[in-house]
């Protein structure tokens, strides 16, 4: 027969104290957990701060190499950067091409503006073409200066002054000359683009493509249609006169 021993008052007190300790440990555990979360958050924040403040680009260190390249001589360009001599020379050549084309168109303008030719529409077309080619030359000159190059103008060849043709007449012959000249200018632009590509100059490549090549293609297409139309109307008479009137009324 087993006797059930009841807890002594001391044991009861101990149990009570033990229960009280357990009761008090729960809030302590929560507090500890909360502290752990706070510490984790702080650690994460510290880690993030470490990543954000990680040194990747040190401008004042890396700039030392570029600073040494800034020219001190007053006769040298301060803006020039990654612009080689071949590109500079090719741009000067293209400037000369554009000025020669402008000069040729100006001669055509003078011919058709004569009192004994008197095709005012053709004169207007060639005057506008001359102005456009000159603007192209000036645009190239501005770009040359912007990149730190030096503009060196070259000689311009004296153009033809007479454009009458025994078989084709002056109107068709002049427009065929124009088509050939536009294609030649386009070839020169492609050559300039090739130099820029070979020299790995993406800025010059973008400039040629965005400012010249698309417009040049449109000009070739436009003049091609003029040649086709003039071949249909014949080289003299009312057909040429009506074509001249169309050019006179056409917007630039």
From Swiss-Prot:
Residues 1-43 form a transit peptide. One of its GO terms (biological process) is iron ion transport. One of its GO terms (cellular component) is cytoplasm. InterPro entries: Ferritin, Ferritin-like, Ferritin-like_diiron, Ferritin-like_SF, Ferritin_CS, Ferritin_DPS_dom. Induction: By iron. Gene3D superfamilies: 1.20.1260.10. The keyword NAD does not apply. It catalyses: 4 Fe(2+) + O2 + 4 H(+) = 4 Fe(3+) + 2 H2O. Residues 81-234 form the Ferritin-like diiron domain. Fe cation 2 binds at residues 133, 182, 216. It is found in: Plastid, Chloroplast; Plastid. Its EC number is 1.16.3.1. Keywords: Chloroplast, Iron, Iron storage, Metal-binding, Oxidoreductase, Plastid, Transit peptide. GO terms for molecular function: ferric iron binding; ferrous iron binding; ferroxidase activity. Pfam families: Ferritin. Ferritins accumulate in seed during maturation. Then, they are degraded during the first days of germination. Present in roots and leaves after iron treatment. Belongs to the ferritin family. Oligomer of 24 subunits. There are two types of subunits: L (light) chain and H (heavy) chain. The major chain can be light or heavy, depending on the species and tissue type. The functional molecule forms a roughly spherical shell with a diameter of 12 nm and contains a central cavity into which the insoluble mineral iron core is deposited. Stores iron in a soluble, non-toxic, readily available form. Important for iron homeostasis. Has ferroxidase activity. Iron is taken up in the ferrous form and deposited as ferric hydroxides after oxidation. This is Ferritin-2, chloroplastic.
């Amino acid at each position: 027969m087993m006797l059930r021993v009841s807890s002594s008052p001391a044991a009861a007190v101990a149990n009570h104290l033990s229960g009280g300790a357990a009761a008090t440990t729960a809030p302590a555990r929560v507090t500890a957990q909360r502290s752990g979360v706070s510490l984790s958050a702080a650690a994460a924040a510290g880690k993030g701060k470490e990543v954000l403040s990680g040194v990747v680009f040190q401008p004042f260190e890396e700039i030392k190499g570029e600073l040494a390249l800034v020219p001190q001589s007053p006769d040298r360009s301060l803006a020039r950067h990654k612009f080689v001599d071949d590109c500079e020379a090719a741009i000067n050549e293209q400037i000369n091409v554009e000025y020669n084309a402008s000069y040729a168109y100006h001669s055509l303008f003078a011919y058709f503006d004569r009192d004994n030719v008197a095709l005012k529409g053709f004169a207007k077309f060639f005057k506008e073409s001359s102005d456009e080619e000159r603007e192209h030359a000036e645009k190239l000159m501005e770009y040359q200066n912007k990149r730190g190059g030096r503009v060196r103008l070259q000689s311009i060849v004296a153009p033809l002054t007479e454009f009458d043709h025994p078989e084709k007449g002056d109107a068709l012959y002049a427009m065929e000359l124009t088509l050939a000249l536009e294609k030649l200018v386009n070839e020169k632009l492609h050559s300039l683009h090739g130099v820029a590509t070979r020299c790995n100059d993406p800025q010059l490549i973008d400039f040629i493509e965005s400012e010249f090549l698309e417009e040049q293609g449109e000009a070739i297409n436009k003049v091609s249609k003029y040649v086709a139309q003039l071949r249909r109307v014949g080289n003299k008479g009312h057909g040429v006169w009506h074509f001249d009137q169309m050019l006179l009324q056409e917007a630039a």
